[in-house]
Amino acid sequence: MFRRMTVSLMVGMLAASAVWADTPKPFPKFEAKRVKPPKPGSTNRINVFIEPKADDVPEVVATESGAIVPASPGQYDWFWDRVSPAVEKSGPGRLEAAMVTLATASSKIPAPRMQQMQEIAKANGIDILRSTIGTQVSPALVLAVITVESAGRPDAISGAGAQGLMQLMPDTATRFGVTDSMVPMQNIAGGVKYLDWLMGEFDRDPILVLAGYNAGEGSVHKHAGVPPFAETRDYVPKVLAAFQVAKGLCQTPPELISDGCVFAAMN
């Protein structure tokens, strides 16, 4: 019997030890510490440090001569070596010089495929023609802008918030009466109105008009010409290259960005 009691006692102790092993240790004892307010005139304060946020890196820098140049070069800086970005050189006649530059330069700007632009014209040609009636904007220019801006996708949305075929920013859309930028007809109408306004603002200068469409007319005025942003400096020749292709889709190719055009094929 004594042996049975001993065995039972040992089993009980082992079971108890297993329970104790699974029991977590108590939390350490914490005591609240009262901090007295500083005495009047004391300089001791609780300081909270927030890591300062770096300012945005400027997109332009000044040279020793005082000229403002892009902080990062664009892909087509050679274009601007031959076509002045300055507003003092503006005028509608600059289109010919710009197109000659594109055609004769050793470096080429990739132009959209004619088939791609033809498909965009088939899908949106009627809306483009309707929107450009009575304006200073060639349908061929609108087609070029649409191709470069959205590749013809009516649902395109940029990281900056530009929307639709002609990539209208919300403020620009509101400014020109667009209530839904995702509706192609409205988007095209708003984009054409903006281009038409820019044509009047910059005396039909194709270089400044396209720069204003990309960067805003305020930036063009601020920099007295094409803003020295790599994106804008690349955008202008890209649209002009697309305009050259778009001209070939017109029954009568336009000479200026204000000339009329009827696309050979439309839905």
Please provide the spans of the model-predicted regions:
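Acidic helix/loop microenvironments that form the catalytic cleft of cell-wall polysaccharide enzymes
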Residues: 146-151, 190-194, 204-230, 235-240, ...
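Structural motif
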Residues: 140-143, 163, 208
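Cell-wall glycan-active module
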Residues: 2-10, 14-135, 139-143, 237-267
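Second-shell loop/turn segments in exported
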Residues: 111-119, 127-133, 153-159, 174-184, ...
